[in-house]
Amino acid sequence: MKNEVKKVVLAYSGGLDTSIILKWLQDEYNCEVVTFTADIGQGEELEPARKKALSLGIKEENIFIKDLRDEFVKDYVFPMFRANAIYEGEYLLGTSIARPLIAKTQAQIALQTGADAVSHGATGKGNDQVRFELGYLAFNPDLKIIAPWREWDLNSREKLLAYAQKHGIDISKKKGKSPYSMDANLLHISYEGLVLEDPAHAPEEDMWRWSKSPKDAPNESEIIELDFQKGDLVAINGEKLSPAGLLTKLNELGCKHGIGRLDIVENRYVGMKSRGCYETPGGTILLKAHRALESITLDREAAHLKDELMPKYASLIYNGYWFSPERMMLQALIDESQIHANGRVKLELYKGNVMVIGRESANDSLFNAAYCTFEEDEVYNQKDAAGFIKLNALRFIIAGKNGRKF
């Protein structure tokens, strides 16, 4: 394939690893390289990536830096949260949900620039290689895919650094840069590697980059109100913001109160177990609020069906199948369930906790106090329950008459 590639679009962060990949592509494939850097709220200046690419010989017209923050939240994060998606009971899928958008945009740039190949910096051990490549092939099955970590012999940090020095790539460490392998976007930040590779070893406090420790969070709680329309967040404390602005605001509130830290061992799609630590402050608040709203607006059987389907939906995202027909089918069902998910949820934030203290919906609430009151009944006849119970017990009654023992 090396002699067949003419132009390749590289998912480029400007960091050491992808800068080495850039140079390696030039040397090994002797092809033109286009760089694509996505702003999905990782919190870093992206212009240095442009300068780094220029210094490595990339033409100005072959450097693409795109602000995808609103698209990321509106078209990926919000649809996922309509489903209350959680992988293996804890993980809010912060890395998983970002990959489809990056892959789609990268494939679009390939079409725009006439590139015949795409490349990424995911290793051959992880989930991201699957997520990226399923995305590429969904949009253009004719694209060639170059995954350097599956090809080269630079399989140690020492070899990578030696390669960088040999080719004049700056290896100086950014001031304050974490030694952990990290991934960040508007939804979360993740940490892997080093002492975290021992699942018995507790993470150091200085590893966490975003949030206060719950122990150091304010001693006074904070009350907030979130407004939803059709299952999507539209305002915080009455203030309407862009999708990215809303998640940014929730992150600020969550970080302030030590909310959203997570330390888990998860099952990767490729078959191994991996330990990761995550901070998802805004997402943790959003999930709690959305479920609270659904508790008054969603029919019982619809809610239970959603809960049954959610693990499958979450696994599809985790494993890289965002663009699959089965995920889209589930999304259509989920979105139908959100037609009446309109209302307001009141939350109290305090030292790592998110507590629901109120929920209301002016036109869509199914909660009717007249039916569930502990006071005198006016609309419900309690005698009706006897027949309901007898009919539901009919199979037990028949089995008992036949001598069946339980």
UniProtKB/Swiss-Prot annotation:
Keywords: Amino-acid biosynthesis, Arginine biosynthesis, ATP-binding, Cytoplasm, Ligase, Nucleotide-binding
GO molecular function: argininosuccinate synthase activity; ATP binding
Chain sites annotated for binding L-aspartate: T123, N127, D128
Localisation per UniProt entry: Cytoplasm
Class of this enzyme: ligase
The keyword Repressor is assigned to this record: no
Sites where the protein binds L-citrulline: Y91, S96, N127, R131, S181, S190, E266, Y278
InterPro entries attached to this UniProt entry: Arginosuc_syn_C (IPR048268), Arginosuc_syn_N (IPR048267), Arginosuc_synth (IPR001518), Arginosuc_synth_CS (IPR018223), Arginosuc_synth_type_1_subfam (IPR023434), AS_cat/multimer_dom_body (IPR024074), Rossmann-like_a/b/a_fold (IPR014729)
A GO CC annotation given for this chain: cytoplasm
Record-linked PROSITE patterns: ARGININOSUCCIN_SYN_1, ARGININOSUCCIN_SYN_2
Known EC number: 6.3.4.5
Plastid is among the record's keywords: no
Pathway(s) where this gene product acts: Amino-acid biosynthesis; L-arginine biosynthesis; L-arginine from L-ornithine and carbamoyl phosphate: step 2/3
Binding site for ATP: A11, Y12, S13, G14, G15, L16, D17, T18, S19, A38, G121
Predominant location: cytoplasm
GO biological process entries: argininosuccinate metabolic process; L-arginine biosynthetic process; urea cycle
Catalytic activity: L-citrulline + L-aspartate + ATP = 2-(N(omega)-L-arginino)succinate + AMP + diphosphate + H(+)
NCBIfam families named among the record's database cross-references: argG, PRK00509.1
Subunit structure: Homotetramer.
Family: Belongs to the argininosuccinate synthase family. Type 1 subfamily.
Protein name: Argininosuccinate synthase
Primary gene name: argG
